[in-house]
Amino acid sequence: AMAGLTSQPAMNSIVAALQHSDRDTGIDPDKIQKISEYWRDVRPVYAGFESELVTSSAEIYKYEIPGGQYSNLKPQVESFGLGHKFEDVKNMYKTVNQMLGDIVKVTPSSKAVGDMAIFMVQNDLTPENIYEKAANMDFPDSIVSYFEGMMGQPHGGFPEKLQKLVLKDKKPITCRPGELLPPEDFDGI
């Protein structure tokens, strides 16, 4: 009752799918059904916190948008007055991810990809025209932080031309961001 939608599949589904196979979990489906029924009854209490997504969707695999971000992306897109372009933003998310080198998307890197996708749709940018049209634009803070190296160094490195466009005259770090923190004063705590 708490899974599905943009989350992982419900445990009941996994247990049932693996039953009578060499990967049978040995979990009693009737016992976990009781847990599901409990959460089915509790879930309405939290209805105010639910996203508008009320059905399961495999789009998260198509666009490679993490489930938690997917459920927050639509309200974020709407907050920019781009609700009518939500499909464009989802497609751009996949495009931006490829522009960045098909990065691992977890908070905060997934936010950087999403912010850049919204920015590009908002400004009618494409991978082809971004270098001339965006030369004098200020990019979202999250994407600047990403290219500065503050989210770490991506496997395969940064796409240099895009990094220079985003950072302008700023220099990226080349070490692990945590190495820049001062030592913790445990005696002073």
Predicted feature residues:
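Terminal or standalone catalytic/regulatory effector modules within metabolic enzymes
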Residues: 54-57, 64, 68-189
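A short, ordered amphipathic alpha-helix with a cationic face
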Residues: 3-5, 60-64
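Functional cores that coordinate and move charged inorganic groups
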Residues: 1-54
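Residues at structural and domain junctions
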Residues: 18-21, 25, 59, 79, ...
